[in-house]
Each structure stands twice: as C-alpha cells, then as structure tokens.
Swiss-Prot record:
It holds the Pfam family Lon_C. ATP binds at residues 657-664. It comes from Yarrowia lipolytica (strain CLIB 122 / E 150). It is an enzyme of class 3 (hydrolase). Residues 964-1150 form the Lon proteolytic domain. Belongs to the peptidase S16 family. One of its GO terms (biological process) is oxidation-dependent protein catabolic process. It catalyses: Hydrolysis of proteins in presence of ATP. The keyword DNA-binding applies. Residues 203-505 form the Lon N-terminal domain. This is Lon protease homolog, mitochondrial. PANTHER family: LON PROTEASE (PTHR43718), LON PROTEASE HOMOLOG, MITOCHONDRIAL (PTHR43718:SF2).
Amino acid sequence: MIDNKVSVCSVGKVVITEVATFASHPLYIDRKTALTMIRSTRAASRLRLGARYYASHAPYGVLSEHLKRTPRTNSQHYYPPPQGAHDLPKVSSMGDSIASIVRGRELWVQEKDKSDKPEKSDKPDKTDKTDKDKPEKQDKDKTDKPEKTKVSHTPSSTASTGAGEAAAPPSAPPSGSGSSSSSGGGSPPAKKKKSPAQTYPEILAVPISDRPLLPGFHRALVIRDPNVMKAIDEMITRGEPYLACFFLKEFSNADVIQDASEVHDIGVIAEIQIQSQDHKRSTVDASNEPVYVLILYPHKRVRLNSLKNPPSSGGAVSYASVSEDVAEDGELLLTSKDLEGYSEEFLEAREEAKKAKSGKTEDSKHDSKVTSKDGKETTEKYDSSTLQESPYSFLSTYDVSTAAISLIEDKPHDKNNRVITTLTNEILNVFKMLRAEDATLREQLSSVVGDILRTEPAVLQEPGRLADFAAALCAGEGKEIQAVLTALDLETRLNRALILLKREHTNAKLQQKIARDVENKLNSKHKKFLLTEQMKAIKKELGVDDGKEKLVEKFNERAEKLDMPENIQKVFEEEMTRLQSMEPSSSEYSVTRNYLDWITQIPWNKTTEDRFNLPQAKDVLDSEHYGMKEVKDRILEFIAVSRMKGGLTGKILLLQGPPGVGKTSIGKSIAKALNRQFYRFSVGGTNDASEVKGHRRTYVGAIPGRLVQALKQTQTENPLILIDEIDKLSSSRTQGDPGAALLEALDPEQNNAFLDHYLDVPIDLSKVLFVCTSNDLSTIPWPLLDRMEVIEMSGYVPDEKLNIANQYLVPQSKKETGLENVNVQVTDDAINALNRQYCRESGVRNLKKHIEKIFRKVVVKIVGEYGQDEVAAEKIIDVEPVEKDKESAEKKTTKSKSKEVNEEPAAKEEKDKATESAESSETKVGTKAPPVTVPEDYSLTIDEKDLYDYVNSPPYSSDRMFEDPPPGVVMGLAYSPLGGSALYIECILDGGLSADSSARLSSTGNLGNVMKESTNIAYSFAKSFMIRNFPANRFFERAGIHLHCPAGAISKDGPSAGCAVVTGLLSLALNHPIDSSISMTGEISLTGKVMKIGGLREKAVGAHSAGAKTIIIPKDNSGDWDELPDTVKEGLTPVFAGTYQDVYDVVFQGLDTKVAAEVWKKQFDLIDRKLDKRGSK
C-alpha cells in the first residue's frame, strides 16, 4: 500500500513522499496542485493522521505574496495576532514534521543565515515584568489604548490571550492541563501573570457539517458562499485570519449560521493558514461555482455565547443553550463489550473512581464557568457593551454570521488520578497495536509513540491533548468527535477517545485480515498463472503441442458465459483440474473432455421469455389447427393461470386420440403460442432406460439421456418437450424399463433435481412443459399415467375433414407439387367422396396422401402437355475425371489434416486450393432444369366422378349392408382407432327347430373375450325377456343360434354391443325385421339395464355415415350427446334408454304380439307330437 504525505517547503513547493514496498522517492509539485490534493482530502471529510494526504505547512504568507501580513498600527486592536505571525518562519522537512504535527505543534526551522534564532521559551517575558511592576498603568492603558504585545505563534501555547497580556512561552504546558494547579515540589514559584481574558469580540462564525475540528490538528474547509469568501479576503488583508468553527447538529452545506440552535455551543477558534486564490483550480462541485479551500489550524476550545445573524436575516442576536455533558464518567459510552481487552489495572482504577464519585453531584453546566488565576471558578457573563471596538467590526458590512465567544479551559484534575493515568496507558497501548496492525499508520506512529513513551511524564501532564490526538486519529461519527470536544473533564474525554480508538483498532484488524486474504488469493492465482505460462514455454521449446491449452481456454470461455449454480461450478472446476493434469494419451482424457464439453453446453439458469397474450395464443392455435376445442381451451387455461401467478410452471399433459388427428402438430403450435423452444423425441419401441437417463461415463461412447440432449439443443431450461408414442414403451430385463425411468422426469415433485447418469449432477426440469401423445391409454403403466393430465382428442367428423382439406391440405399439397400458381381445384363433393369411400379414418393423414396423389397425377399431365419443348438438351458429362479430381483433392485434404493444429500459411493455402478444386469439380455433375411454364388460362377442376382416374376404385362402397334387413339383423355401432362405423349383428337359426335340436349359441367374427361375454349376457337376458313377455313363444327351447359380426379380419371387442345383440336375438325369435335406419349402442346388464359407453362422437359419425336416422344410446350418455357439435348431430334423432324396455318400444313398434307369440307354434306342435310318439313307444 502506498501512503502519500504532503509537506510544504520553505520555498513554496510541496513535497509528496510515496512510501512503497520496494522504493521511495519524492515528487515536487507546485502550490496549485497541492491545493487540488488538499481539496481531495475534503472528500474524505477530514485531514488526519493515517489519511492518504496529510499537510503540514508554514503560515499562509510563505506561499503567496498576496497573503503577507504587515505590522499593525491600529491602536484599537483588541485581539492581537500571535507572536511570530509577522516573521514568516519556514517549515522543516517531512521526516521531522510528522511527529510534531500529531502532537499538535509546528516545528519552526531556522533561517538560512543561522544567525536569526528564536528566543528560548523558558526566558521570562519582558512584557510580563513590565505588567507586573506597573499594574496601575496597565489598567489605565486598558481604558485608553491597548498595549501591543507579541504572542508566541505555536499550537502548543494557549493561543488566546487578553488585551495587553502575553501568552505563555512555547515550552510551557497549556492552561488547563494541570500545571497551573500544582507548582511542583521545591521549585521556585512562577512569576504572576494576568489570567487571559475569557470573552472575545464578535468574529466570523463558520458551521462545520461533517466532522468537528479538534485543537492542534489541521483541517481543510471548503467555502462556497460568495459573501463569506469576500469577508475572508478582507480578514486576510487586515491581518485578522481568525474565525470560530462550530459543528452543525444537522447536516447542511450552508456557510452561514442562521441561529445559534443550529450548532453545538462548544467549538474551536481557528487560524487560516492556507487560502486558495485560483477559483478554477478550487472548483469542487458539478455546478462549476468558485469555492475557497482553507487550511485551518484550531487553537483552543471556545463557547458560543451569542450569534448575530446575517443582515439579510434581520441581524437578530440568538443565544446558545448550554450543553450538558451527559455521562461525564463515560458510563453511557463504555459498554460491557467495550470493556473487553482492558487491563486489570484500568478496571480496578475505574471501579475505585466510581465509588469515590457515588453520591456526589456536579453542575452539568460547568462549561459556562471559568477558572481564575487563584483556582476559583466564577461565572462570567458576556456583555458586548463592555467591550471595546472590535477589529472584526467590518464584518457587519457582509452578509455573514458573527459570534461572541468565550475561552473555556479543561477542568482541574489531580495528576495522580489512577483512572486518568490508566486511561493514558491504555491509549498508548492501543497506539502500539495500531502501529502493528495498520501498515498505513506504522511509519507515522512509530516516531510518535516512541517519542511519547520516552516522554511519558510529560504526556501524563497533558492527557487532554493525548485524548484530542486519539480522537483526531479515529474515523468516528461527527457526534462522537463532538462529544470528545465537549468533554472538559479529562477522565471523560480520555474515556470517550479510548472507545473510539479501540473501534479504530478493531477496524484496522479487520482491514488487515481482508487485505491479507486478498493478497493470499492473488498470490495463489499469480503463482498458478506463472507456472502455467512456464509449462507452455517448456512445451513450446520441446515442440510438444497437444492442443490442451486451447481446449482449456475454450471450456473456460464457455463457463464464463454461463450462470452455473454453485454445485455445478464446483464440479466444473474439479474436472478442469483433472483435465489439466492428464496427458492427452490417457484413456481418461477423452472421457473428461467429453464430459466438460457436455456440461458447458447445458443452458444453466437460461430461459426464454414466455408469452402471456391470450388473443395472440388463440390466433396461433386457430391458424394452424381446425377444431380441437378441448385442447385449445386447456392451453388457454394454462396461459391464463400462469399470467395470474406471474410465471409459467412445468406441466405434464397427455394428448390421447386416434392416429392422424394432429397430436404431434398441436404440440408444435403450443410451443409457438407460448414462445418456447420445441423438441420432440419418440419412445415407441424403446426398451432401454439409458435413452431417458443416459449412460454411465465408464462406458465407451456414453452420452446423456434424451432429456439432457433436449436442453442442449434448445439452449433453454424451459422448452416444450414432446414425448411421442408413450403408450408403445417396452421393457427389457437387461436394459431396464424406460417407463419407470420417466417417472422421475414427469413427477412435478421430483423433476427439479433430475439426475442424469452421465452428468451425475442435479438438473432442474421443473420449468419444462412436457406434452406426451398416446393412442391407447390401456398400455401405459398406471404410475406413469397418474402423473399426467389426460386430454382426449376425438377423431374428425366429415365436415371437419372437409374444412381441414380446404384450408390446409389442398394448399400445402399444391405448394409441394409446384401447382401453387396453377388453377387446379378439387371440389367439395370430391373431398366428401374421398372421406366416404377412400378415407374413413378419424384422422386426416390418409386423406392428405390421397390429395397429394391427385395433384401428382395432375403434374404428370401438365408436364406431359407443356413441358417437353422447354427441356434443354442434356450434355454428356464424363464423370470419371471428376471423380479423379475429387479423389486427389481428398488425398491432399487428408494429408493436411494429419498435421498439427498450427499449420503453416503455405500448407493452409494448398488445402484451400484443393478444397476449391474439389468443390468446382462437384458443381459440374448436376444441372438445374428450367420450370414448366403453364398458360395463365389453364384450368382444371376435379369432381367426384373424376376420382377414379386419379385414385383408382374406392375400397369402401357403402356403410349400409342391408337396405331391407331380414329378421335377426340389426345395426350396431363400433369405435376403433380408425374412427366410428356401423357394426352389423347377424343372427340366424342354425339347423332349424326339431325334436333333435337343442338350445345353443355360437358366435363368430373375430370377437374378443369381453364381447363374447357380452353376447352370452345378451342371450340369457333375451331368453328371460321372452319368457316374461311372450311365454307362448318357445323359440329359445330348441333353437340353435349362430351370431356373426361381419368383417372378420378386424378384431372386435368391448361390451357396447349388448343392446344390439339382444335386439338381434329377439328379432329372430319374434321373426320381426328391424328398421334399417335405426342404429344403437349400449352395454346390457343381466337384468336389462342399459349402461354407459364411450366413443359416442365416433359412433355418431359412423351412424351418420351408414345413413341411420335414429340412434339409441344409454341415458347416462345424454350429457355427452349435448356436447357434440351440431354437424355431428344433424340428421340423427337420439333415443335415450335407461333399460332395454325403452329400446324394445322403439325398435318393435307395430309388432302384433299375438302373431309374435304363435310364430313358431307349428314347429313346436310337430316337435311335441314326435316326442309323444317316442314316449308312447
């Protein structure tokens, strides 16, 4: 650390000595630069020991000819200047001045001609002798004309004397220090002197805002008020450079005191020793206003008796209130914490002093009393009328504040007081500790403390000055320093100064510790840097360059751009240390390098800004997808909730629906609506858990899982990740279960610390929006399904498919086939025919294929008609030379790659030429054909009748198998991944009714177990229904029934065909055909209850496609029917059935019950006769 110390030489120069660790040299600057430096000390709010700048200088007359003082001739001077002010003494060098300054003295140096020496301070003053011998004459002179005397101009003297009185010599102790009360044993009595006057004329009063002045210690002061500047100029011109300084109670930048209550009543009288004259160099504020920078030397403590306001404020006189010195014994300032570290001697002395003072009271307003020469305290009242004309009377012409002040002295004390002695020793001990702790103060304090220790008896006689020095050294608050200035009781002053000094010592220790830690850290980094540079130099000399340095530099650059969490940063630093300590040939080198490459590409704490605009999100979803109301509403709800909460959180959504309905594409639209990055990966057929959670680093070619790869690719922590085909996961005994691995990632309570096997550090996935797709929920593991919010996506109805084709599929297909600007139209009838006869699936993927096929046929037709004449003749290209050139270029490139990373310029140039030759050779291979020009009047319309020419014959002719169905045939409804369709139930009598036949039911049609059980339940219910309603009809006693569901290649399962099976069996038993326009669905119970089914939307679409007019559905599905779009319900009459009786009433209207009861009577009569014959035999 560099400590700058400023001193003024006798020739008007300023010397700055820089004390550094390795060198020390002086710099000489001019006066203006010195004032600029002094001004900068104002920003530090004080000039004190230990600051960066400390100035000691001669009186103002040395630096400027303008400031030279002339001998006074005014006989009415009431306050004579100090002795030596006319003689312009010189200041010593820096080495000798520091110790003198901190003790509050100036060291006067002899002139160049050694002959002019100052008189010794121990000689008696002739003025004193004259005054003693002629007291009466002196009293007379007081009335007529004050006697001009010279006062020693040394800070150690009591710089305030009365009219016609001489001050003590420089070597005498200050008044109030205890020397006046004790004469010392055996010494001759001192000559009597007149006691100094205690009341002074009205002089300029200046407020101090940041830190009070202490007697004996220089201080810089900035004056901004122009009136105060002018007053100071005249004061300097008149040779009266003295002013009173008082500390403000509240901070203010004013230079005028408006009322005595604004300042503390105890301040100092100070002498102006340096005044700046260059306004430009003295400007310190942003307004560029001229200011004065004054260097003040405070002499003595004074009390403010009264204050005269500026003339602009009325010139009223306000009187200062006497401050009470609270806690004179220091109890309020000295806490139990402050007592830590005190010596036992001090604590014992302190307790004895407290006991001695117990029960006694003192007048708290002792500051208003003065001490006479005989040691008695008297109260002196200020009366301006008794004073003679003041040399400062000219100040009344300026708009400044003036004050009447009184000199105050320290309270008498016993020099054998143990508490004062112990406090003095404690302060000296703290000085020693400060010298050891603070390097800035070490040089100054070494000389000061050493001198104090050598002259300890003298210090004990001046404890007040020691307390002021300690307070000036400390960086306490202004009120704390003012408390030291106010304390006239030496014990209290020492106590308060000691507390401030101990706080300064604590701060010094803390600063030293911080500096030590910083230095150690810097040294460690510097050492590491030097070793690294040396290693680079050694490798360069040996010709070994493995590229490790560039790799390390690349990783460090990446890491600086990332906001890594603390734990990730620690792992990164450890792996970097490992990488630097490895050799490139090591097997672990590539593993660590790949790991660092991954960990520095993860977007730690980096997110994209979400979009909370509901109308804009709705427009994005509607522009890219038709329908899907439930999905769009859920996304808008998600955005609205996030807007209400103030931020988006991670969600796990599952879109379940048939293929081709847009589950994957809606995921992209959701990401676009939310302004998030999109990443998709399919887990269909995945049977390795490492695909989700990554591989261990020990395996060759190990990489992180797909979730970490998604973060790397999207470069954000809040993307939308689409996990496609999650219902097609599989498991393996050896490679784990990927479905179980997804449990951690898809659990909102756990994914904030997802642990990938490769990275092996927690990763926050809580901000990711997961969207999964599935065709069948039954194959998803239940724990995984429980973590997701399921949104069902139904298949499209014909009207929706028509709109999707016109708005999306047809324009997209025309653009892909080059017909974007050609007038080719596909009519709505053609698209409806495609949906009805070619593409019955719930999705539109197959419809898109057929539309693309149509436009491809159109393109072939157009190119064949208009494109043959425009095709340019193809040139025959010899491919072999091209391949040879390419091979040679590749060989050159391979050779250049085998060299070191740092190639020579010539090698790089060859490589570039080889690459250019290879590229130029490759460009000769392909040719670009000109586009076909189609006439503007060309037009083509594709109608339903033209479909055969483009997409061949339809695979489906009609959904209705029977226009007039026979008895036993009924139209049911089925739902499959392809959508809804009509499912006919056919029942026939197998083998007729005979005596040898028996009741039985057989079923075919690739039925599943659930549907087989449903047919058995329906058969049992049908028999019971016939017994209850048609007891005479004995059909089910002997009938062998065969039940079949057409389209045997398609597997069928589910309980929803129960009502249709019962109806088919009853239709056969009653020999009554069912209307072909009636379709039905519903599960039947054994007692005839019609139960709720699923897939009502698709089944309604199937009924509509089959031409049904009436649809019978369970009563519990009435709410689902109301939610269906009107385009689906149009043309269908719903019938809600609670029991099968409701179904029977609709499908068997107009049935003749008598005929139905006897429809099989003839057959059963024959059977009975045969059985009777067999019985009679």
